Regions:
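Glycine- and other small-residue-rich loops at beta-strand/loop junctions that grip anionic moieties
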Residues: 94, 286-287, 321
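Helical hairpin unit composed of two closely spaced alpha helices linked by a short loop
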Residues: 287-308, 313, 318
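Cytochrome P450 I-helix active-site segment
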Residues: 143, 307, 311-318, 325-326, ...
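Histidine/acidic-residue-rich catalytic or RNA/ligand-binding cores of hydrolases
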Residues: 293, 322-324, 354, 372
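Catalytic-core elements of nucleic-acid end-processing and repair enzymes
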Residues: 350
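Thr-Gly-centered strand-to-loop micro-motif
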Residues: 284-285, 312, 342, 361-362
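N-terminal localization/anchoring segments of enzymes in phospholipid and broader phosphate metabolism
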Residues: 1-268, 272, 276, 300, ...
């Protein structure tokens, strides 16, 4: 029986890997090659080389980026760009909840369909469980909106159910894209009441050719969901329009990661930033359940005099994850990492910055699920003025935090410490 299950799972994984590779082959042809986007920054050329060789993620020196430090700032900008759409709208989110915020978005999408704009919506079958019914799928179809559910929840045992589509990507006309920590639900924009009082998150808006990578990522994931499209070349070329240069400052590298590429791209970027830091590293993450390699890199950076600061929630979102995370935080504090507990509510932002010159923003948490199991995306930013705004947001956020001490850990309820220690053994599964 065990051999049968193993063989069945291996066959399924091989099929999925093959689908991923075929989808990449058909979409990456529309994304610039390294010769067209050579980095003007030799000090980061090794990372640029790695990202292209490992995932076909090119450097863009002609695109601009805008940072949003909260959902309230993101939402009106996002809504306006949806209204401005002329050709197509692609939305890929882990969570879409049919609440007030989604209804506002849906009204615009309905209007754009009547104007001839192609609208596609892709969402995860577990994250968006309330929208994952066949009935809701049919409802969107009745509005003229194409939709797909990635890996709907089924009663049949399937290890692939653990590999969720955790990405947050929006593409408008192939010229503008968004990514970050925000999903499409009320709490992310602080609409009405939520159990955390305030939800702190972040996002970026990309304008220019760098959007091509996000367009390709969306189409790849679209093809992995049910009923993949057979013809790429003729139907997909229109989603990659020619775009004039928008910026001559710094560079952007949009990137992604998943459980099937066996490259650990997301973690390797974190390790790279930590290894190159000369003054400081600032991180925000809602969860902290990491492997020994990343834990050691954080501790080593602190031990060589780098000011390493980590902002995490003070309140639990998922109780067991919170308990396990506390054991990792204790280890980091013991070894010189500054841990800040966010007090006003829940921080869901995923930022990784260093020395005021490099930063990442995206959907990636510092936990096993994001780093090794899920489909994720991010944006690497280098030597752009927007990094100053990101750094300023982090410093302002620290003012709303309490720095964690070992005494704080000792004062935790016994049940939190016990569960954390017991289940830390199973951290890769949580």
């Amino acid at each position: 029986i065990s051999l049968y299950i193993y063989t069945k799972m291996a066959t399924r994984n091989a099929r999925l890997k093959n689908k991923i590779e075929q989808s990449k082959i058909q979409t990456w042809k529309f994304v610039p090659k390294p010769t067209e986007t050579k980095s003007a920054f030799p000090e980061i050329s090794d990372l640029a080389f790695y990202l292209y060789e490992s995932g076909n993620f090119p450097v863009y020196t002609d695109s601009d980026v805008e940072y949003f430090s909260c959902g309230e700032d993101f939402f009106p900008d996002f809504m306006q760009e949806l209204k401005n759409a002329k050709e197509f709208i692609f939305l890929e989110f882990f969570i879409i909840t049919p609440d007030d915020s989604w209804q506002k978005i849906l009204e615009i999408l309905k209007q754009k369909v009547t104007e001839g704009v192609e609208v596609r919506v892709l969402y995860d079958g577990i994250g968006s469980v309330l929208a994952s019914t066949k009935l809701y799928h049919k409802y969107l179809a009745s509005l003229g909106i194409k939709s797909k559910i990635y890996m709907p929840l089924t009663p049949v045992f399937n290890l692939q159910q653990n590999n969720r589509d955790h990405r947050k990507i929006a593409v408008i006309d192939g010229k503008i894209s968004y990514t970050g920590g925000l999903n499409l639900a009320n709490e992310y924009f602080n609409f009405g009441q939520n159990k955390f009082s305030y939800w702190k998150d972040s996002a970026v808006k990309i304008r220019g050719n760098a959007t091509k990578t996000y367009t390709a990522l969306f189409l790849q994931m679209w093809n992995l969901a049910k009923f993949p499209e057979k013809k790429f070349n003729k139907s997909y070329e229109k989603f990659f329009p020619a775009i004039k240069e928008n910026s001559k400052e710094g560079l952007l590298i949009p990137y992604a990661d998943n459980a099937y590429n066996e490259k650990d791209i997301a973690e390797n970027i974190c390790l790279y930033i930590l290894s190159k830091a000369t003054r400081n590293v600032c991180i925000t993450t809602p969860y902290i359940i990491i492997d020994n390699q990343l834990k050691s890199a954080l501790i080593f950076a602190a031990s060589r005099g780098i000011n390493v600061s980590l902002i995490v929630p003070s309140k639990p979102d998922h109780f067991l994850t919170f308990c396990i995370g506390k054991t990792f935080l204790k280890t980091l504090v013991e070894n010189g990492v500054h841990v800040y507990l966010y007090l006003p509510g829940f921080i869901h932002s995923k930022l990784f910055t260093s020395d005021g010159k490099i930063a990442t923003v995206g959907s990636i948490n510092l936990d096993y699920r994001s780093l090794f199991h899920h489909f994720e995306d991010g944006l690497l930013i280098y030597k752009k003025s927007v990094i100053e705004k990101i750094q300023r947001d982090i410093e302002l956020t620290k003012l709303s935090c309490k720095e964690m001490t070992l005494d704080d850990y000792k004062k935790l309820p016994l049940i939190v410490k016990m569960l954390g220690r017991i289940f830390r053994i199973f951290a890769p599964l949580v």
